[in-house]
């Protein structure tokens, strides 16, 4: 199966190599942009496909050249050469996966599904390449005689352990099974994430009567009306399952049934026995991860994952959780007492439900401390928060931030771009911030990069770092984007 996929990839790649390169910006050796920032607005879906296939083809040739080198393995001709390989593939992946969660489209999702098995097979071609691993192992075993510096030792260690964890020391039958598991997991994990993105952005609680929204800040009511209009329910009010849309309902809405509807919709994403249901996918992922861990000699997938993390093993995680458990439960019980008290004042009998917690905790805070999240948020306008973070970074690390949104390529109108400058006035990084929810954007928050720091000879190449969140939007009327603690 793996050989068939690789052969198909190479054949298609060679066919593409005959095409004119000038129309694909990803194939250019250097981007004709400030600091070679990817020209986002010029890249098409077909450009990604061509660059990925060409990149895999090029890296395979580079790997084969390392394996077939007649000279004895050295740090330079094996470890450094491997580290330098795949530049086109890595550059393309940095842009594609940097945008696949923040600016996804049906076309990009289809391409991601198409490429997933090819990229998995390509990764296995390297990680389970016996000839390549033997050269890496020879350098690793003889490192005491090589006079390597600290960075070279670190790269050697990471490279060797990466091969071991990738299955290089398995026998042929286990390598084949590991490769099959990798491809299945790549497909399932991608499908899981795409399903979750779909349900987060396309699951709605719709309200017809504005009186049902009593308690919500006016700005959130306006946003609900705007969302309803955008999604074909003009004159009504809609909440999707992005946190900035549904959280205000759980925190401020007096209507208990509305809070229940939102809570249940959010917690039942991908659980509707339809094409986006993730239950069977989750079970398959768990089973395959366990099989892979056992194949690699680990008792559980947690043992395998934690080996390279600070915790090292599951027992240490449980020990930390056990230390936290008692004080956490005590604090939760105190909060629960506050919630019960506030519910009794509202004439509600019985134990609190999950959709009562945020609402009544906020009411308890108001009563006990004469303060509410809504009041605090007036001081947390998004641009003020950003400037506060930049001020802190300057005081702690001497970093300054200069906005360059209008000067640099943009992948979406909501994102901003910044130069990051050190105490000496040197540009040390490009920073892209992207803070508002939208269709095609994954839930949550993350830090990533379009390009890592590297050196091109003696010249340092600045990293392009991204910070992506889903914070509260401004109102349609141009009101402030107020955040909560």
Model-flagged regions — what are they?
Residues 284, 465, 478:
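Acidic/His-rich catalytic or pseudo-catalytic neighborhoods
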């Amino acid at each position: 199966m793996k050989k068939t996929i690789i052969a198909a990839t190479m054949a298609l790649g060679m066919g593409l190599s005959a095409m004119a390169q000038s129309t694909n910006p990803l194939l250019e050796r250097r981007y004709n942009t400030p600091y070679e920032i990817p020209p986002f607005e010029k890249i098409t879906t077909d450009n990604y496909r061509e660059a990925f296939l060409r990149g895999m083809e090029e890296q395979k040739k580079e790997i084969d050249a390392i394996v077939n080198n007649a000279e004895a393995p050295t740090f330079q001709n094996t470890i450094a050469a491997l580290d330098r390989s795949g530049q086109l593939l890595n550059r393309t992946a940095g842009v594609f996966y940097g945008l696949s969660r923040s600016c996804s489209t049906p076309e990009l999702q289809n391409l991601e599904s198409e490429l997933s098995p090819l990229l998995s097979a390509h990764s296995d071609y390297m990680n389970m390449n016996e000839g390549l691993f033997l050269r890496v192992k020879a350098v690793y075993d003889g490192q005491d005689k090589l006079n390597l510096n600290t960075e070279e030792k670190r790269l050697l260690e990471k490279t060797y352990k990466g091969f071991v964890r990738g299955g290089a020391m398995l026998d042929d039958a286990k390598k084949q099974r590991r490769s099959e598991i990798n491809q299945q997991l790549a497909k399932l994990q991608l499908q899981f994430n795409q399903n979750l993105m779909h349900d987060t952005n396309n699951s709605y609680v719709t309200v017809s009567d504005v009186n049902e929204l009593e308690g919500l800040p006016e700005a959130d009511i306006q946003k609900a009306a705007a969302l309803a209009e955008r999604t074909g329910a003009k004159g009504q009010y809609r909440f999707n399952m992005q946190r900035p849309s549904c959280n205000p309902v759980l925190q401020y809405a007096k209507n208990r049934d509305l809070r229940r509807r939102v809570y249940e919709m959010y917690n039942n994403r991908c659980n509707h026995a339809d094409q986006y249901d993730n239950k069977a996918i989750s079970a398959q992922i768990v089973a395959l991860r366990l099989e892979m861990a056992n194949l690699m000699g680990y008792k559980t997938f947690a043992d395998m994952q934690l080996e390279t993390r600070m915790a090292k093993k599951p027992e240490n995680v449980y020990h930390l959780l056990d230390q936290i458990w008692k004080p956490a439960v005590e604090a939760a019980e105190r909060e629960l007492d506050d919630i019960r008290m506030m519910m009794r004042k509202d004439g509600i009998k019985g134990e609190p439900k999950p959709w009562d917690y945020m609402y009544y905790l906020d009411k308890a805070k108001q009563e006990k401390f004469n303060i509410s999240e809504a009041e605090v948020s007036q001081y947390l306008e998004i641009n003020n928060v950003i400037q506060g973070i930049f001020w802190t970074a300057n005081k702690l690390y001497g970093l300054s931030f200069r906005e360059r949104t209008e000067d640099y390529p943009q992948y979406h109108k909501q994102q901003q771009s910044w130069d990051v400058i050190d105490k000496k006035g040197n540009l040390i990084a490009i920073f892209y911030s992207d803070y508002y929810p939208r269709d095609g954007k994954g839930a949550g928050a993350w830090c990533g990069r379009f390009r890592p720091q590297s050196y091109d000879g003696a010249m340092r190449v600045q990293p392009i770092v991204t910070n992506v969140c889903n914070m509260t939007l401004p109102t349609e009327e141009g009101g402030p984007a107020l955040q909560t603690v």
